[in-house]
């Protein structure tokens, strides 16, 4: 198994010198934009890439992602709605140095990489760390996802993508985090930092850097809670590498809250007139090739960045691409990676395959057949071992009850589990 290559310990001084080089390298008018591709342009790119693939592009879209139900739109068709409009449009990138990428399975098997250790501005990918730090504080009991948090003068009118709010508007902390991962709302990111940092955003950013260090992200430095450019913050760019962002993404998809929120196609809030304000996900690849998240990011000096996480059967992949010139290129490059992956995937077991008999403790039948709930794949060149686990169910069994697990292992380490389901109803002993 190959892990991210070339990562080295870097002091803050070393990182600061890299930032200076990056700032000097990237020139051009900051803040100016031109119209971006239309949605139909992006759909054409997606459809063209999908046509090149022999496999069904929806393969791997499962009813559950990591134990969390795949999310559906929250729009109520019976209520009036308005779609949110960005304050500013994304434009052309001024970054012209070539793509940076790191694509690997969750367990670290590298599928593709290029300039993966080159430091680069990451724009709104920064918000993933914002969310990770906040969830750490939730786990410690310092804040709650149910906290009612209100916008104030310091956090309301942050530029770029934003929630259309006014001072005094209040939201649950959970919904602010959802707005970060789904819509990339900058004012939400600042309000979260203000709330978790107890009124001090700099304190929160220090927590972001400590979390990066704890994860082993040795070439990453955060200056803001949202990833906005220097022209808007007066601070250095938030920077990282493709290989470091893979590490961050792996931590993110280990959290079921993030998996759930990242898979939502839209964010819906009711305004004071009972009108639904709809903020559509910026991830246009949801539910293609098993993609269920994770985050996009753009400013002119960073280009178009994107991390996606995909689950196809037992195979989970993280793909990091930085520095695309346009949104269309960002989409196209991600689809090419998954098209290449599809050509390397070998079906080991079909969904519904009979995996043998499983024990029942207190049923009229002592054994029952179990079938796989999902497909099992291997990537050519990356063989797995498999282990069947009998749960020896002691309760009532209905058709579809989980009665076992198929574990996928690599070098003895657990990679993933797929449920094995009962094929019939079985009554308990003594029942009529």
Features from the language model and the residues they span:
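Active-site-adjacent loops and short helices of periplasmic peptidoglycan-processing enzymes
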Residues: 60-243, 253-256
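Short secondary-structure junctions and interdomain/linker hinges
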Residues: 53, 184-187, 344-348
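Ser/Thr/Gly/Pro-rich low-complexity, disordered linker/stalk segments of secreted
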Residues: 1-74
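Residues at secondary-structure transition points
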Residues: 12, 34-38, 233, 303, ...
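Domain-terminus/edge residues, biased toward the C-terminal soluble/receptor-binding domains
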Residues: 217, 234-432
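Generic alpha-helical secondary structure signal
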Residues: 13, 40, 171, 202-206, ...
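Intrinsically disordered, low-complexity segments enriched in small/polar residues
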Residues: 4, 26-30, 58, 64-65, ...
């Amino acid at each position: 198994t190959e892990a991210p290559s070339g990562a080295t310990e870097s002091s803050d001084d070393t990182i600061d010198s890299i930032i200076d080089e990056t700032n000097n390298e990237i020139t051009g008018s900051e803040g100016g934009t031109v119209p971006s591709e239309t949605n139909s342009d992006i759909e054409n790119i997606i459809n063209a890439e999908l046509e090149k693939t022999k496999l069904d592009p929806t393969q791997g879209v499962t009813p559950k992602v990591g134990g969390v139900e795949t999310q559906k739109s929250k729009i109520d068709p019976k209520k009036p709605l308005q779609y949110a409009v960005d304050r500013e449009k994304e434009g052309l990138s001024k970054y012209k140095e070539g793509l940076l990428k790191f694509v690997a399975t969750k367990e670290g098997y590298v599928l593709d990489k290029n300039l993966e250790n080159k430091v680069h501005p990451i724009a709104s990918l920064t918000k993933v760390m914002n969310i990770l730090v906040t969830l750490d504080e939730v786990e410690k009991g310092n804040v709650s996802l149910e906290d009612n948090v209100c916008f104030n003068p310091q956090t309301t009118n942050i530029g770029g993508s934003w929630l259309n709010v006014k001072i005094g508007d209040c939201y649950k902390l959970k919904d602010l985090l959802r707005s970060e991962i789904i819509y990339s709302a900058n004012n939400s990111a600042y309000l979260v930092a203000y709330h978790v940092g107890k009124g001090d955003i700099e304190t929160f950013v220090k927590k972001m850097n400590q979390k990066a260090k704890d994860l082993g992200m040795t070439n990453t430095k955060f200056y803001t809670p949202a990833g906005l450019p220097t022209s808007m913050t007066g601070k250095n760019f938030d920077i990282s590498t493709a290989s470091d962002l893979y590490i961050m993404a792996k931590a993110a998809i280990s959290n079921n809250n993030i998996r759930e929120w990242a898979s939502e196609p839209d964010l819906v809030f009711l305004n004071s007139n009972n009108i639904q304000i709809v903020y559509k996900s910026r991830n246009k690849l949801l539910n293609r090739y098993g993609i269920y998240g994770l985050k996009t990011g753009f400013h002119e000096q960073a280009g178009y960045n994107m991390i996606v996480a995909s689950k196809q059967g037992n195979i989970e992949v993280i793909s990091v691409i930085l520095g695309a010139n346009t949104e269309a290129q960002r989409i196209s490059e991600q689809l090419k990676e998954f098209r290449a992956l599809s050509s390397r995937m070998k079906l080991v077991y079909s969904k519904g395959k009979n995996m043998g008999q499983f024990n029942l403790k207190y049923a009229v039948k002592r054994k029952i057949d179990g079938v796989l709930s999902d497909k099992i794949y291997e990537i050519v060149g990356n063989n797995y071992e498999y282990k069947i686990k009998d749960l020896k169910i002691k309760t009532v069994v209905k058709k579809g009850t989980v009665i076992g697990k198929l574990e996928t292992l690599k070098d003895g380490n657990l990679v993933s589990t797929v449920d094995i389901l009962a094929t019939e109803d079985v009554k308990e002993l003594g029942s009529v």
